[in-house]
Amino acid sequence: MRCKTLTAAAAVLLMLTAGCSTLERVVYRPDINQGNYLTPTDVAKVRVGMTQQQVAYALGTPMMTDPFGTNTWFYVFRQQPGHENVTQQTLTLTFNSSGVLTNIDNKPALTK
């Protein structure tokens, strides 16, 4: 009889403390990396006045291009470490009608 009471009490105690679990960090969550991974060295290779072909050679294919025909390329890298906040790096390159780079927007700034 006493064994059944202890077992029932242990089961109830276990159910009550299950909501207060600190196992969140124990459970493995893989790092998720998506997009164009660019280093500060890669970004430093790009200069205003380069052609689209030169930029594509230096950085690779952009993640996205502007669908409205404004000759804008987006290099986006999103990183979600297992139990940390998501970070995102966006490099936006704008070209003129001749395909020459006119503007570089690096947010947040990726520097050495």
From Swiss-Prot:
Gene3D superfamilies associated with the record: 3.30.1450.10
Topology relative to the membrane: Lipid-anchor
Lipidation feature positions (S-diacylglycerol cysteine): 20
Xref: InterPro entries: BamE, BamE-like, BamE_dom
Covalent lipidation (N-palmitoyl cysteine), chain numbering: 20
MF annotations from Gene Ontology: protein-macromolecule adaptor activity
Role summary: Part of the outer membrane protein assembly complex, which is involved in assembly and insertion of beta-barrel proteins into the outer membrane.
Subunit structure, as described in the record: Part of the Bam complex, which is composed of the outer membrane protein BamA, and four lipoproteins BamB, BamC, BamD and BamE.
Protein name per UniProt: Outer membrane protein assembly factor BamE
Source organism per UniProt: Salmonella typhimurium (strain LT2 / SGSC1412 / ATCC 700720)
Gene: bamE
